[in-house]
């Protein structure tokens, strides 16, 4: 009469979310939107894929790193976004953008390591509705 003990439930480790009632800043909201978009296979990384996605009118939002060292790269992305009416948001670092896009290894503590920089990301599909998406859309409309 051996009874099996139930297996312990392990909760997935997530990025720290802001406390309820506390306003979410744009960068946290953008990170949340990218995570949801990546889960729904709606994230495009890199110049070539981003340019193709913008040209096909599939892009809803473009995120560009400010510390990109290729001026032609920045000029091309900005011109494509302006031509095809795609909203452009800039973030300070390519490393943080790469981390948000999932271009890194996650260690046992849930921290990102071996982060690869990413200069441009295009969101084709937002995934599901969230508070972060509302904040990003309000920011884009105000520009």
Swiss-Prot record:
GO MF terms held by the record: structural constituent of ribosome
Annotated Gene3D superfamilies: 3.30.1330.30
Recorded superkingdom: Eukaryota
Pfam family for this entry, one: Ribosomal_L7Ae
PROSITE patterns associated with the record: RIBOSOMAL_S12E
GO cellular component, one term: ribosome
Gene Ontology biological process terms in this record: translation
Keywords assigned by UniProt, alphabetized: Ribonucleoprotein, Ribosomal protein
Recorded family membership: Belongs to the eukaryotic ribosomal protein eS12 family.
UniProt protein name: Small ribosomal subunit protein eS12
Gene: RPS12
């Amino acid at each position: 009469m051996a009874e099996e003990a139930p297996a312990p439930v392990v909760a997935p480790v997530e990025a720290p979310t802001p406390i309820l009632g506390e306003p979410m800043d744009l960068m946290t909201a953008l990170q949340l939107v990218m995570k949801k978009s990546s889960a729904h296979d709606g994230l495009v990384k890199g110049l070539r894929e981003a340019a193709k996605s913008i040209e096909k009118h599939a892009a809803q939002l473009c995120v560009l790193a400010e510390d990109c060292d290729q001026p032609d790269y920045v000029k091309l992305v900005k011109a494509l976004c302006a031509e095809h009416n795609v909203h452009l948001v800039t973030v300070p670092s390519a490393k943080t953008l790469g981390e948000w896009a999932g271009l890194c290894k996650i260690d046992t503590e849930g921290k990102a390591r071996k982060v690869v920089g990413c200069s441009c990301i295009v969101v084709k599909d937002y995934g599901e509705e969230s508070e972060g998406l509302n904040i990003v859309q309000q920011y884009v409309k105000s520009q």
